Amino acid sequence: MKKILSIVMTVLLVLSVAVMPASAEADKTLKFGEDGKFRILQFADIQDNAFLEYATYQFIKDSVAELKPDLIVLTGDNISGGGSPTKTLAKFGIARFMSIFEKAGVPVAMVFGNHDSEGLANKEDQMAMYQNYDCFVGCEGEDLTGCGNYNLPIYDSKGEKMLYNLWMIDSLTYNRHPE
């Protein structure tokens, strides 16, 4: 009986490992399609408050459906920090458009603009909110001024050779030079 139980447990262990991806990063590899194309859809200055305007929501949703991008890049002022003054409202505002991308299964990268952190949710708080989405391929970054400095390699259709390397750089909130 012990031998049978041991065999069953071994088979279950092998099967459970076999269906797991090699790593979380393997699922997020950006690569060209078999057609040799890689389409990036950029949204800038969405900048609505926590209650995303219906027209904006529909425009984003329709654009993703029609253009079928391989990557979506949000290039700042993704929320209106002043219009989403609390962390809860910032999270709700981010969820309104990220839910579209998550449902479509399209990878998303982002950088911050000067209005994103005007409320109580700072950039680090917001980065953590974005990282809760499976479709998000960005990160906080290390050893550089700002939050969200990272690169995204884009590989050929086989995922073997890096063809492009996109850099996401935090331009900081406002340009402040010491006197």
Region spans (language model):
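Active-site micro-motifs of SAM-dependent methyltransferase domains
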Residues: 15, 48, 80, 116-117
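Active-site-proximal flexible loops/turns
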Residues: 9, 49-52, 84, 120, ...
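Sec-dependent N-terminal signal peptides of Gram-positive bacterial secreted proteins and lipoproteins
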Residues: 4-22
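Extended active-site neighborhood of metal-dependent phosphoesterases/phosphodiesterases
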Residues: 26, 93-179
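Residue-level signal for beta-strand positions within conserved beta-sheet cores that form or flank
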Residues: 20, 36, 162
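N-terminal active-site segment of His-dependent metallophosphoesterases
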Residues: 24-91, 96
